[in-house]
Amino acid sequence: MKLACAQFQHEGDRASSLDKAIDWMAQAKGAGADLIVFPELAFDFFFPQVRADERYFDWAEPIPGPTTERFQAAAAQHKLVTVINVFERAAPGRYYDSSPVIDADGSLLGASRMLHIAEEPGYNEKFYYWPGDTGWPVYETRAGRIGVAICYDRHYPEHFRALALGGAEIVVVPTATSMSEQAFRDVWEIEVQASAVANQIFVAVANRAGLDGDLQFFGQSFVAAPDGKVIARARENEEELLVAEIDRQDIERVRRHVPFLRDLRYDLYGPDRR
């Protein structure tokens, strides 16, 4: 099968960005993709770089809502499993950074909410987001069993481990990682490769690209295989539709050769063992 990471730069307004994203879905399908993942908040200005501005709460929408429903229609049209990311309004005063997961028939399978919320220069997220409460769902899709790690979640190995133990074959990572985060950029691929090989899963990272306000998103989206190797990598700073061919049977082959999960004593790692 093939998966696509949409290394995307928003167009200055949501309507134009959504039009472009839908066109990219058609391109991905034309390239043979079965799954496409878009970056974090790809269709809007990355507002968390602005500290404590209540106006941005007006940008949030429910799930399902207008953005999700538009992607549901496109997913059904192109028979393409689709993972996006939106600013979710779940209830009055309750907002999340969320990734709806849409199957190839257009059905909304659910949404994963970012569990770990950052607070650092350029990423003033605690003002805007509640900590996610969805846990680690694994979605049964036509492209396989998919889990989601949104941006900051990727820094926590426990997140990938929970998804792998839940049966995930592919973990997708919608992110908005910029050049201002030098410490994160230094480990950009290494930490994901480590999680891929430790759990013997595929990981697909979709980053934003280009200048957005004060942040320069550097792109370099990539796909890591169950043996930890990077098998596809996008350009730096520029938009690109990265399409990678993967074989989910590689998971079985790697786990037979080195059965990390079989030998894991997770019964020893409960909260009462800390």
Language-model features, listed with the residues they occupy:
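Cys-nucleophile CN-hydrolase/nitrilase-fold catalytic domain and related Cys-dependent amidase chemistry
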Residues: 14, 25-105, 177-194, 198-201
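Short beta-strand scaffold segments in enzyme catalytic cores
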Residues: 84-86, 98-101, 137, 221-223, ...
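A short C-terminal boundary segment appended to hydrolase-like catalytic domains
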Residues: 249-274
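Active-site catalytic loop in hydrolytic enzyme cores
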Residues: 73, 90-166, 179-194, 257-260
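Short beta->alpha transition motifs characteristic of CBS
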Residues: 48, 100, 111-118, 222, ...
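CN hydrolase (nitrilase-like) catalytic-core segments centered on the catalytic cysteine
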Residues: 63-83, 145, 154-241
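Active-site-proximal beta-strand elements of phosphoester/diester hydrolases
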Residues: 1-12, 17, 37, 98, ...
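Short, acidic/polar
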Residues: 16-27, 156-161
